[in-house]
Amino acid sequence: MSRTAGGSTRLLLGLAAVAVAFAAADTYVVVLALPDMMISVGLGIDELQRAAPIISGFLLGYVAMLPLIGRIADIRGRVPVLVASLVVFAFGSLVTALAFDLPSVVTGRFLQGVGGGGLVPATLALVADLYPVERRAVPLGVVSAVQEVGSVLGPLYGAVVLAVADWEGIFWLNMAVGLVLAAALTRLGPKPAARSVVEEPAEASVSKPPLPDILSMLLLLVALAALVLLLWEPPALYNDVTLGLPFVPVSGDSRWFTPLALVTIVATVALVARCLLAKRPLVDLRSWGASFGRADPVGATILALALAGVILAFASADPSQQVFSPIGGFLLAGSAIAAVLFVWHLRRARNPLIPRGSLREMPAWASLLVSFFVGASLIAALVDIPVYARLTTYKDSQLQAALVLLRLLVAIPIGAVAGGFLTRRLPAGVVCGAGMVLSTAGFAWMSQWGAHSLENQIVTVPLFVTGLGFGLALAPVNAALLASTDAAVHGVASALAVVARMVGMLVGISALTTIGLRQYFEALRRRPGHELAAALVQIEAIFVGAAICSLVAGALALVLFSGAKTRAAPPRREGANAASSRADRA
C-alpha cells in the first residue's frame, strides 16, 4: 500500500478512525441503557449480577478474538478486515436491537465486541502501512485521540438517543452507521488487481465490474428477513390466526423450534454453500477460509480460552466484595493451563498466531508491559473519580459525578495529539515517561483530596494533568511497537497491545479495589461509625496505587523504549560528510 499521504489516504484513514471512535462510544453507551435493557429481558434493577454477561460478553468478544483478527489483518489486508469488522459490528447491533431474552442480548453484544475490537489493530496497522516510521507518530496520535473522543462522547450519545427513543434505537443507529462506514471503506479501499489485465489488455480496459451473485443476494435477504421476524415477532403477524402459524413452535416453547427459525437456518446454510461454490460469490468464503487457516485458529482458540478465563474471573466479580468471581480461582487456573499450552503450541506450530521472533526487539515486548500498567492506572480514574464525587459533593447526582470525570477525559485526546507531534522530535520513551510522570503527579494530588475538595475549582488541575499524561503516552507506545516489529505482524502486534491494556484494566481495578477495601475496613476498625472517612481512606489508597502503576509504566518506557527508532535519522553535518569521504578515498 502506498506510503504517500494523499487525499484518498487521509480520507481512508479518517473513515477508519471514525469507525474506531464509534465503536469506542458504543463501549460506554450501554452504561446508560443497561437498566432499560435489563427490564426488557425480564431482569429486575436489583439483579445487576445476573446482567453482568451483557458487559462481560462484549469484553469477551472485544479482547479474546483480537489476536486472531489482528493476524488475519496481516494476512488478508487491513481494509478487508476493517470492512468485515464493521459488518460484524452492524450484525451484532441488529441482534441486540431485536433481542428478546438475556442470551440473545449477550450474543449481540459479543458480536459487537468482536467487530468493534477488530477495528483497532487493523487501523493502527493501516497507519503503519500508509506512513513511514518517522511520520506515523502524528497519525497514531490522531487515531488515539479520536478513539478517546468517542469514549468521552459515548454517554452523551446514549443520553441523546434515549431522550427521543427506546434503548433499541441506540443499536439500530449503530447498525446503520456501521453499514455506511463499511460501504465507504469498501469504495475507498484498494481494489484487487484483475488477472486479465496483462493477458487481455484491450478486453480488460472496456470490461465492467462483474455483477454480484443474484442467488446469494436473494438467500441473504431471505435469511435476514426471517431472522428479523423471528426476533421481532411483530404483533400484526404474530397474533393473526393464519399469518401467525410460522411463529408457533413445533416442539416446546423456544422460538428456535418454529417454522420461521427453520427458514432462517436453511437460508443461512444455503447462503454459506453458495458462497463456497459460486464462481463470483457475494462473500468469498473460500479465500477468507484460507486466510483463517493461515492465521493459526488452533493457537487463537487456546489464547482466547486463556483470555476468557481472565476476563470472566475479573469482569463478573463485584469489586466492592471480592477480587474475582466465586469461581474465579478455577477460571484463572484454567487460564494458566491454557497459557502454558499456548506457549508450547507457538514453539511447534508451522504458522503460529504470533510468528516466532515477532516481539524479539526490546521495545516491542516492552510496549505490552507498558500498556498493561497504563490500563491498570487508567481504570482507577475511570471508576473511582465518579465514586469519589458521589461520596462527597454530588451524593444525589450521577450526572454531576460524571462531569467531574469529564475534566480528565477531555485532556486525553489533547495529550494524544500532542504526544504524536512530540514523538516525531523526541524519543518515544521520553514522551511516554513524561506523560506517565504527569499522571503520577495527578494521582498523588488527588490522593490528598478531602470531603469538600470538589467545592474548589483547583481540582480541575490534577484531573486535567492526569488525563493529559495518559494522552501523551498513547502515540509513543504504539509508535515504539510498530517501529520495532515487521510490517507482516503489525496487525497481531497491535492487537496484543490492546489486549495487554484491557487485561491491565481488569486486573488493575480488582487489585486496587482490594487494596482500598483493606484500608477501608482497617479505618473502620480504628474509628467505628465513620464510614465517610473510611471511604475516603479507601479512595486515597486506590489513587496511590494508580500513581504507582503510572510511575512503573513511565519507568519501563523510559528504560526499555531506548532502542525504538521512531524518528528520522538526523542529517549528517556537511563537515562530517566531507571527512568521511576523505577517509573513504584514503
Predicted segments — roles?
Residues 1-8, 193-211, 282-289, 560-586:
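Intrinsic disorder in cytosolic terminal tails and internal cytosolic loops
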Residues 23, 55-62, 89, 113, ...:
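Structural signature of transmembrane alpha-helices in multi-pass secondary transporters
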Residues 74, 79-286:
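Helix-loop-helix hairpins in multi-pass membrane proteins, especially solute transporters
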Residues 24, 28, 97, 113-121, ...:
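Small-residue-rich segments within alpha-helical transmembrane domains of MFS-like 12-TM solute carriers
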Residues 31, 121, 151-159, 307, ...:
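Glycine/proline-centered helix-kink
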Residues 11-38, 46-56, 295-300, 312, ...:
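Transmembrane core module of solute transporters
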Residues 65, 76-83, 134, 400-573:
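C-terminal module of multi-pass small-molecule transporters
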Residues 37-38, 72-73, 157-165, 389-390, ...:
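Interfacial helix-cap and linker-helix signal at transmembrane-aqueous boundaries
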